[in-house]
Amino acid sequence: MENATRIVFLGAGNIAGPYAESIARHPELSLVGVFDVDADKAQHLAESHGFAAFADLDELAAASPDIVVNLTSAPYHFQTTKELIGRGLTVFSEKPLALEPEEAAELVEAAAASGTRLACAPSLWLGAAQQAAAEEVLSGRIGRVGLVKAEVNQGRIETWHPAPGSFYKVGPVVDAGVYPITYTTAVLGPIREVTAFSSMTVPERIMTTGETFTPGRDDTWVVSAAFESGALLALTCNFFVGSKTQPRTVTFHGDDGSVVLDDWLLPGAGVRAAEYGEPLTELHAADDSSPLDWSLGVLELAAAIRDGRPHRTSAEHARHVVDVLDAVALSAFDGRRVRVRSSFPSPFKAVGATA
């Protein structure tokens, strides 16, 4: 497509392939190259998808990308994003924006000072099902939301993933709880207070190779949070219960009814709604043929640049999510309530009342 948004990757790890496949489905995006400190990884990805492998960051920047997608490992997000911003480049970062609240705040300030755009995953809340549920909540048809319940059941990753260590190093809240936390705050606004409990349910894990390891973080978490709006969130996150046993749902309960998103991950998930006291009825039909689209946030950022409007996957929102994740850890480890003070502009006001 003529005038397609030029995309480059920083990082060629496991998630880079799915990102490349998703971007290829959108002609308005053009993936032109990748740089990774592991040159072999970068070359393999480039050859597999038909774009360039850059020798270093200078060569990446010289390609004049419209957006750099930062797919480095989480511990490197802060430093690499900071360097990209320093080069005047627009960045879409994989989640989380940073591992520490102070680092996330520094990135937000750096982007604002340099006049560059900074966006961040997760962006799967921009999917069709997630937007349908959000639209129903924001329409006011279920009234004031008082309670949200969310389930993150990621199962025992070591039973299928060849290298599960990175998941267990950060734990289920940072790895996957970030999805419903990002989604519910996008819909309802900032969280102001958090309490959390955690435990090590399975202290010894057995990999597909037969090797054993001990998770670096507790594998089961129960989180309670209070939104600024007054609504409460009940969130469970674990690497213990499988999603086929207990679905990955998000349910909004309001004064006048409820909305159920059957899966916070899948764009083709079903959405059901009901007036108070009535049975749930289908609002958005499930579509198992809808693939995960990892490029939704990149697509949104590109569209916002073209339209001259704020992007919905804002750095301010991502910073708030980092603050919430930090509050969850502090609460569980210190046994106390933890306040969250950061705020962010509503992502739905960026393009109107709803997506």
Language model features with spans:
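Active-site loop of classical SDR/Rossmann-like NAD(P)-dependent oxidoreductases
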Residues: 37, 287-298
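Contiguous beta-strand/loop segments that form the cofactor/metal-binding neighborhood of enzyme cores
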Residues: 182-267, 295-309, 343-355
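N-terminal Rossmann-like dinucleotide-binding module
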Residues: 1-49
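Predominantly a Rossmann-like dinucleotide-binding segment in NAD(P)-dependent oxidoreductases
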Residues: 124-214, 335
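Short acidic low-complexity segments
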Residues: 52-63
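Hydrophobic residues in well-ordered beta-strands that form the structural core
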Residues: 55, 70, 93, 118-120, ...
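C-terminal helix-rich "cap/oligomerization" subdomain common to oxidoreductases
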Residues: 1-4, 14, 24, 59, ...
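Beta-strand-loop-alpha-helix segment that lines the small-molecule cofactor/substrate pocket
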Residues: 62, 66-67, 73-74, 78-125, ...
